[in-house]
UniProtKB/Swiss-Prot annotation:
Transcription regulator that activates transcription by stimulating RNA polymerase (RNAP) recycling in case of stress conditions such as supercoiled DNA or high salt concentrations. Probably acts by releasing the RNAP, when it is trapped or immobilized on tightly supercoiled DNA. Does not activate transcription on linear DNA. Probably not involved in DNA repair. Coiled coil: none annotated. It comes from Photobacterium profundum (strain SS9). Signal peptide: none annotated. Residues 493-671 form the Helicase C-terminal domain. It is an enzyme of class 3 (hydrolase). This is RNA polymerase-associated protein RapA.
Length: 972
């Protein structure tokens, strides 16, 4: 390379160094000083990774003194360029600027500048950049954004609720599904959508203390949302960074008790400007008109100060009407201002729900029901619709459509339809059956002796303490024998468990017991006696260790056959891949029993659940098993009445459990009384069901359509190819581990020091939803995952693939024929929270010009064209660019005219789509406001101002050249 002192060069590998100056050279080396960052580099002269900087006529260059010059003439003397032209500030002509006096800070940010400066990237990177832009655009435009990327099964009612609520601005809703239907996942999906759409940047989740870690893990594992748990210690630590500790994190998780106990922390939380508040277990907030609880007041104040609120609660039937009203009051105190008015309103909707039940079941609609429907939908003539439904076959497609139109209209007018979602198992299909297998086993003599001696020595303990003690004879035995007691050598439940596991070698078995020590002892017994692979899961383990245990259990090959859990194993972890549940002992209340079964009996479970209950005859264990089974039927069915019945009969039950000898008659009477109460309460709950609300909450066909649409996107080969190309370009190591899993780790040759979303020691990823669901240690990669979103942002911001030169081997065209491919981006500069991404995200426009300026982009698709091209080495690429620089300038100018026309079309299309969408919603809500007071004024005002703001942003959208590729036809 010919180097001369004073010449200006740029580094090909370190473009951020700015403009360099040759300060020394000899036969073998050259030294270049980069004054902008006060660094110098010594290169081997023969292959220095630098490019000569030469500006052309028409360019505007900056001097080191800060003034700019529009170049008219370029002169060269002794290898040094002098630029002659007009100063832009004083308009003085024929000003000379020698290249040594150019600004050191000049960087080549425009693609054409990079191309002319020889900063030419690889062809595959250009293609990757274009794909990144098009995929990013498609994801922003997708109505399913925020729903496809979560690590969860595709459950219709969950997706429907999340889709319905997640697209609203500042949603304020009550999620009141029955247990096991996935309220936490629904809330997570809503949060995820709000975050991706930019509607929620600051989120506060308030939960009972025991559920903090569960929520932390769920949000991180399922939605890649990283929350921080705030307690007193964290608040004190944060004081160094801010006066209000809650302003030091965007996503905060804390316990309700923490805010209740400290007025100062509560006030700080209240002042922290949240966009979205989520409250779990909201049914525990006690309220009465004259005396609301402190917890209720805390949530009420936070809800008042926060635009969006999600309350997760028990079903309205379980809550009772007054308590249900108190939750609604938190969401909209202006609308739900008086309890008696609310009760009267609810009463008026009862005949509507009855009419809808008849409508759906195909029963004849009597005159009363018909009158109810006609009165409520007075603004439309529904008589023809009713006649069509009654005269048509129940499966007739047109009649089905009309049915759903009627239901949608009714739902919009329903008292709480917009703010309350509630699904019941009775209304949702897809739950497996539960089969109970009871195994009465003989009580060992060792236990008999220990229990007798313990009874003599226990003195005056309460009946409740005694009852609990008698449920766990192994603990009583251990009290006398000490730590070295080997009760597992003679306990028949252990022998039964070993035989059961040997008989079911290919099954994954979940064993739950009340205490951590029991789980640890059983693991030792299984290992030492039969070499059975087992793992434990208890409260003494860290979250990471629990994750590892769960992953070991989930592993198909070489995984554990058994997971031994203490009671916390039935909190928040789901193991749907197993259908075998062993209860080594029994919990002392029905809610915990349901929680245990709920680890396997969840929506999405594919097989019937086998519940195994080994119990020692004549003990409290046996008595409790019979009461659960015959009094509540809580093994084989979910039991919404369990707590109410338990509280009513608990004195009698505890008295029986505390007896060493059980009277069969007393047990019989208790079971009879409990069963009668259970059936009576269940009938009442069933009668109180609001069929209209159920129909709305489960989403019907719309919910199934969502599942179909998302399923069709799962396993997208385009995503897999793009992701692997992205990781390769950034410099990540990839190691295929089989079983749909790839290990991704950082390398020494990465483009950046750390990669977004990738732990420093790497991670294992999968593109398969089912694999991700069965193995919690894997990251589920989708277009929404931080590793992909962050990778695309990195690729675009670092200018990767902004320029390229390729050869087209085509003998049908003359050799040397020139083509220029340019990618422009339409960008509306607007806050993310405005919702611009839904209508006008960054939009790529591809222009492919031949040498005559004809635009071939509509005739020549990108991928097919790209496959016909060959790469060119950088040295040859620079030569080609320099030889046709004038032609490229002309083509870029022609492309600007072409893309200006496209910009008008893109703006008009975005404006029309925005108006159609938002204006339709505004018109609908304005019409409904007359018949449904649940429509809030601020909702209408928000849509009106949004239409106005978006119109301004769309009208000001600009274009920018993002990347370009020179293509030269070759016959070689």
């Amino acid at each position: 390379m010919p180097f001369t002192l004073g010449q200006r060069w740029i580094s090909d590998t370190e473009s951020d160094l700015g403009l360099g100056t040759v300060v020394a050279e000899d036969k073998r080396t050259v030294s270049i000083m980069f004054s902008a960052c006060e660094e110098s580099r010594l290169y081997a002269r023969s292959d220095a990774p630098v490019t000569r900087v030469m500006f052309n006529v028409g360019d505007v260059v900056e001097s080191h003194e800060g003034w700019s010059l529009e170049v008219k003439i370029v002169e060269e003397n002794g290898g040094i360029f002098t630029y002659i032209g007009t100063r832009t500030d004083t308009e003085e002509e024929n000003v000379k600027l020698r290249e040594i006096f150019l600004s050191h800070q000049i960087r080549f940010n425009k693609p054409q500048d990079k191309l002319f400066a020889g900063q030419i990237d690889r062809m595959d990177r250009f293609a990757l950049r274009y794909r990144a832009l098009t995929n990013q655009y498609e994801q922003h435009k997708s109505p399913l954004r925020g729903l496809c990327g979560m690590r969860a099964g595709l459950i219709p009612h969950q997706l429907f609720i999340a889709h319905e609520v997640g697209r609203r601005y500042a949603p304020r809703v009550l999620l009141a599904d029955e247990v096991g239907l996935g309220k936490t996942i629904e809330a997570g999906m809503i949060i995820h959508q709000q975050v991706l759409a930019g509607r929620a940047e600051r989120i506060l989740i308030v939960v009972p203390e025991t559920l903090q870690h569960q929520w932390l893990v769920e949000m991180m594992r399922r939605f890649n949302l990283h929350f921080s748990i705030f307690d007193e210690e964290r608040c004190v630590e944060s004081l160094a960074d801010a006066t209000n500790p809650f302003e030091t994190a965007q996503y905060v998780l804390c316990s309700l008790d923490f805010l209740r106990k400290s007025r100062r922390r509560f006030e700080q939380a209240q002042d922290a400007d949240w966009d979205l508040l989520v409250v779990d277990e909201a049914h525990h907030l006690e309220w009465s008109e004259d005396k609301p609880s402190r917890q209720y007041q805390v949530v009420e104040a936070l809800a008042e100060a926060t635009p969006g609120v999600l309350l997760l609660t028990a079903t309205p039937e379980q809550l009772g009407r007054e308590s249900h009203f108190a939750r609604l009051r938190l969401l909209d105190p202006d609308r739900f201002y008086d309890y008696d008015t609310f009760v009267e309103e609810e009463r008026q909707y009862a005949p509507v729900a009855e009419a809808v039940t008849r409508l759906l079941s195909g029963e004849k609609i009597d005159d009363n029901a018909r009158k109810t429907l006609v009165d409520l939908l007075s603004e439309q003539d529904i008589e023809p619709k009713l006649r069509l439904i009654e005269s048509s076959d129940a499966d007739d497609e047109h009649a089905q459509t009309v049915r759903h139109e009627l239901i949608d209209s009714l739902m919009d007018r329903h008292g709480t339809g917009r703010v309350l979602f509630r699904n019941t198992r009775a209304a949702i299909k897809g739950f497996p059956e539960r089969h109970l297998n009871m195994y009465p086993l003989e009580l060992p003599s060792q236990y008999k002796t220990a229990m007798r001696v313990s009874s003599m020595m226990s003195g005056s303990i309460s009946a409740e303490q005694k009852a609990i003690k008698l449920l766990y004879p192994e603990d009583i035995y251990q009290e006398f024998e000490g730590e070295s007691a080997t009760w597992w050598n003679f306990d028949p439940r252990v022998n039964w468990l070993l035989e059961m596991l040997k008989a079911n070698r290919n099954e994954k078995v979940l064993v739950i017991c009340s205490r951590a020590q029991t789980a640890l002892t059983l693991e030792q017994a299984l290992r030492e006696r039969e070499g059975i692979r087992a793992t434990v899961f208890h409260e003494g383990m860290s979250i990471i260790d629990r994750d590892k245990a769960a992953a070991y259990f989930a592993q198909e090959d070489d995984g554990a056959q058994v997971l031994l859990c203490s009671e916390i194993g039935s909190e928040g972890r789901n193991f749907q891949f197993s259908n075998q549940l062993v209860m080594f002992d029994l919990p002392n209340n029905p809610d915990l029993l349901e929680q245990r079964i709920g680890r396997l009996d969840r929506i999405g479970q594919q097989r019937d659940i086998e519940i195994h209950v080994p119990h020692l005859e004549g003990t409290s264990q046996a008595l409790l098993a019979h009461w659960y089974n015959e009094g509540l039927n809580s093994f084989e069915e979910t039991c919404p009445t369990g707590r109410a019945v338990y509280e009513a009969v608990s004195d009698d039950l505890i008295a029986l459990l505390a007896c060493e000898k059980h009277e069969p008659e007393a047990l019989e009477n208790l079971i009879e009384k409990s069963a009668a109460m259970h059936h009576e309460l269940k009938a009442k709950l069933d009668q109180g069901r609001d069929r209209l609300l159920e129909i709305h909450s489960n989403g019907g066909n719309a919910a199934n359509d969502l599942v179909t649409q998302i399923s069709s996107k799962d396993g997208d080969t385009n995503l897999i190819a793009f992701s692997l190309g992205l990781f390769d370009t950034i410099g990540l190591n990839q190691d295929d581990k089989g079983e749909n899993a790839i290990v991704v780790t950082p390398s020494e040759h990465m483009m950046v020091a750390s990669y977004p979303g990738l732990p420093y020691d790497g991670c294992t990823i999968t593109f398969d939803r089912e694999t991700a669901l069965s193995r919690e240690d894997l990251h589920f990669i989708s277009w929404e995952h931080p590793m992909i979103q962050g990778g695309i942002d990195l690729l675009l911001s670092e200018g990767v693939g902004a320029t390229a030169v390729s050869l087209l081997k085509n003998k049908a065209l003359p050799a040397g024929t020139l083509l220029l491919e340019m990618v422009y981006v339409v960008d509306a500069q607007a806050p993310k929270s405005s919702g611009i991404g839904r209508f006008l995200p960054k939009t790529p426009i591809r222009i492919l010009l031949d040498a005559k300026g004809n635009n071939l982009s509509n005739k020549v698709a990108f991928e097919g064209f790209n496959r016909q091209l060959s790469p060119v080495n950088r040295h040859l690429a620079s030569k080609l660019v320099n030889s046709v620089q004038k032609e490229i300038h002309v083509l870029i100018a022609q492309a600007e005219q072409e893309v200006a026309k496209e910009l008008v079309t893109v703006r008009e299309s975005a404006q029309t789509e925005m108006e159609n969408s938002l204006q339709a919603e505004l018109t609908r809500l304005q019409a409904l406001k007359a018949v449904n007071p649940n429509i809030r004024d601020d909702e209408l005002e928000l849509i009106e101002s949004q239409i106005q703001d978006l119109t301004g942003y769309i009208g000001k959208a600009q274009i920018q050249l993002d990347s370009l590729r020179l293509i030269v036809v070759s016959h070689n």
